[in-house]
Amino acid sequence: MTANNPQNRYDYDVVVIGAGHAGTEAAAAAARLGAKTALLTTNLDTVGQMSCNPAIGGVAKGQIVREVDALGGLMGEAIDATGIQFRMLNRRKGPAMHSPRAQADKKAYQNFIKYRIETQDNLDLRQETVEDLITEPIADGQDRLANQRVIGVRVRGDAVYHAPTVILTTGTFLQAIMHTGKSQSAGGRAGEGTTAGLSGALKGMGFTLDRFKTGTPPRLNARTIDYSGLEEQPGDDDPQPFSYLNDAISSPQMACHIAHTNERVHDLIRANLDRAPMYSGQIDSRGPRYCPSIEDKVVRFADKSSHQLFLEPEGRQTCEVYVNGISTSLPRDVQDAMFRCIPGLEKAAIMRYGYAVEYDYCPPTQLWPHLESKSVSGLFFAGQINGTTGYEEAAGQGLIAGLNAARTAASKTPWVPSRQDAYIGVLVDDLVTSGTDEPYRMFTSRAEYRLLLRQDNADRRLTAQADELGLIDAARRERFHRKLAEIERGTELLQQAKFQPETGPTVRGDVYLRRPEVTWNVIAEQVPELAGIGREAAEQCSIDIKYAGYIDRQQAEVHKQSRHAEKSIPVSFDYDKIGPLRNEAKEKLTKVRPLNLGQAKRISGITPADLALVLAHLENNSLSQTKSSASVDKRASSDNESSRPTSSASDSL
């Protein structure tokens, strides 16, 4: 939509639409960079709300939260302040697999995020309903691909927010429909409506939209659960914080509990599949593979006689319990009957029924790696609108979109972490390069260099870059440098210490620490000076030393792979000019517009032969340009020489 002259106009550098986990991180990041930012949401009471499970982190997700924190984001501090149970997953595996996870006090988490947004400099939080995007055409030649630019948004009530950059973080609210049995209603979350106008606006701009589905389980009243026969799942004895600003977690922890479904439950579900929207044909959108509904579990894993259910308290001052593992859109009467068949839950009262949500998303191959639209300059996308699932994935995207919107508004070049620098880099690259045909969830297996992308070293990977970008404050900077100094001091002390093993010659402390049975604490008992090294610095020293060989090999592999991978490809590169290139390759490369050979390599269907042709063409172009430049220089030199007087002429003068 083009601009007119509304009665009320507000001017900003960045406007963010939606105040969930992506929107709050986006707005906060833009504001930290000094951009005048507006965060618009239809309901101020749902800022930072946990729509589904009351937890942060998990396998690979916990690493993303640590990265968001290392870049100055909100999520790590929020869960440290409001968590009610902390666990480090995969402790029995190597450090690359360690993943922090915490249960949250749902309302306390939401209030923490909202207050941080309200008190952030350069940021205005407004309750508004956005009805349209305002754009203007771009003159030919001003942008190599985009044919229009965003200049603001129109909200309900004859008002306009003008800005050179806009970020869409609309979650599951685009054209959203909720399903419980045959019952349907418009809305992206129970008790709330949908955002219909923006889907139409995006389609009108030429964007392709598709549909995904997600779901949520029932919530039970804790007072009606018989915990006596359920397995208790406590938190860690030594809970570790998510944020690098915190040394420890001191708040008391609450236990979760484990229940199990059985054949009675499964038979009930099978008997009612014709009433399940996913199986009756009422829903034809694809849902998250790794968070299936209980209906899906019973059908897909028919040989299993039982499925685990995790009973997760939603806070310290509520009786609501989230039943992780039984997401469903079956009718209410079936949900009631299911719980009556589960030991410990026979008398459980449902406080909120489960439901499924269908919603529009924008396939992310329409974006550049910095999450700006290829066709509409200044328009950014982050979170579930890009086809992802999960609070953590949304937060990571939000931060990247926010900082790049602010940089774009200030006419600065974009910044995106690479795949070898961060899980966030893996996430963004996967989305914009390959897209996704199902809700995308991060796993450690998606990262080629996961030994380098550990949860313990996110600050060492990213905080220095965050400082250069202007994302962090002085307190975080000083704390980071103190930690680096501690790591250096700890390494020096280990190298200076001498140990006499039971067999063999005397060895240095760092050499002794490489032994599998030797821990930091064993050495610290004999080197009192190590007592001054903090827990995180000690952990870093230990991992650096124990896994030095593996880390060195992975870093060498990164260097090897990046030799050609970093070869840049012009945005307007014409693949049709490469005669021998397969038509499939031409189509896919033109669609994605990879910025370098590394990104081109990761496009599905692109072969090594295709890459070789592209590389050869790039090098030939470069060589031709070099020769052309040299020829011009030579002609210019010749012209200059001919314009100078010869020696004989000089003599005659």
UniProtKB/Swiss-Prot annotation:
Listed PROSITE patterns: GIDA_1, GIDA_2
GO terms for cellular component: cytosol
The UniProt record lists the keyword Hydrolase: no
Pfam families found in the cross-reference section: GIDA, GIDA_C_1st, SAM_GIDA_C
HAMAP family in UniProt: MnmG_GidA
Similarity comment text for this entry: Belongs to the MnmG family.
Task performed by this protein: NAD-binding protein involved in the addition of a carboxymethylaminomethyl (cmnm) group at the wobble position (U34) of certain tRNAs, forming tRNA-cmnm(5)s(2)U34.
Keywords from the UniProt entry: Cytoplasm, FAD, Flavoprotein, NAD, tRNA processing
Protein name: tRNA uridine 5-carboxymethylaminomethyl modification enzyme MnmG
